From Swiss-Prot:
GO terms for molecular function: carboxylic ester hydrolase activity; serine-type peptidase activity. Its EC number is 3.1.-.-. It is an enzyme of class 3 (hydrolase). Gene3D superfamilies: alpha/beta hydrolase. It comes from the Bacteria. This is Putative esterase YitV. One of its GO terms (biological process) is proteolysis. Keywords: Hydrolase. SUPFAM superfamilies: alpha/beta-Hydrolases (SSF53474).
Length: 255
């Protein structure tokens, strides 16, 4: 039987999904991050498949989303996008420490994955935590600074004035530089990393992520199988079942 528990640690709500017989055992941990305007329970199908394979799956609630949400228009929420991502990276560490303290992680076998904003978060977290043993980015991007600059350019092209002091913009830019994997690919340390991206994606651009993959392939020359990019020529911003199953398979192989 698969158990689903709604828990909270240090103010972070999350769903904890695991086989009943593994509830108090040390097993591999996979943290899966949801996308923008989504919520933790929207990825229960992925967590179920992970739990079936013997993993402990954890689905955190991102700041300003789901049960942490507020009455906020999408446009207003978008203004908090990078704060949400950077906060989520910090909270991933809190969750890891919790399960580690409880003795529920098997030998440091920890994986991280996410869709869209969750994929972006995953790639940033790889710059922060060397204990992440394997990662999967579904429709994500490592190019934090480039994406942020594109957002600013888009707003300005619409004739909209950015109601934020330039000093704060530059402060955020510096914070993003610290978590921009495209600026420090050596932090991957040849860890297993899978990308899935739809070529017709108009939300998170396909080309920059593909370019990053092509750039880092040389880092994996000794173990090329540990780096994979699946580009779906017919897909847009929606993860198909095949990509979900590949995610499960990736963690089965590398955790």
């Amino acid at each position: 039987m698969i158990q689903i528990e709604n828990q909270t640690v240090s103010g972070i709500p999350f769903l904890h999904i695991v086989k009943e017989e593994n509830r108090h055992r040390a097993v591999p941990l996979v943290i899966f991050i949801h996308g923008f305007t989504s919520a933790k329970e929207h990825n229960l199908h992925i967590a179920y498949l992970l739990a079936e394979k013997g993993f402990r799956a954890v689905l955190p609630e991102a700041l300003h989303h789901g049960e942490r949400g507020e009455e906020m228009a999408v446009e207003e929420l978008a203004g908090h996008f990078w704060d949400i991502v950077l906060n989520e990276i910090e909270e991933i560490g809190v969750l890891k420490n919790h399960f580690e303290k409880e003795g529920l992680i098997d030998g440091g076998r920890i994986g991280l994955a996410g869709t869209s904003m969750g994929g972006i978060t995953t790639l940033g977290a790889l710059t922060a935590y060397d204990w992440i043993k394997a990662g999967v980015s579904l429709m994500g991007s490592p190019n934090y600074v480039e994406l942020f600059q594109q957002q600013i350019d888009h707003i300005q092209s619409q004739g909209i004035e950015i109601d934020v002091p330039e000093e704060k913009v530059q402060q955020l830019m510096k914070r993003l530089e610290l978590r921009d994997l495209s600026l420090q690919p050596e932090k991957l340390q040849q860890r297993p990393l899978l990308f899935w991206h739809g070529a017709k994606d108009k939300v998170v651009p396909y080309a920059p992520t593909r370019k990053f993959y092509d750039t880092i392939k040389s880092h994996y020359s000794e173990q090329p199988e540990r780096l994979q990019f699946i580009g779906d020529e017919n897909a847009d911003h929606k993860v198909p079942r095949a990509a979900v199953l590949k995610t499960i398979e990736w963690f089965e192989t590398y955790l």
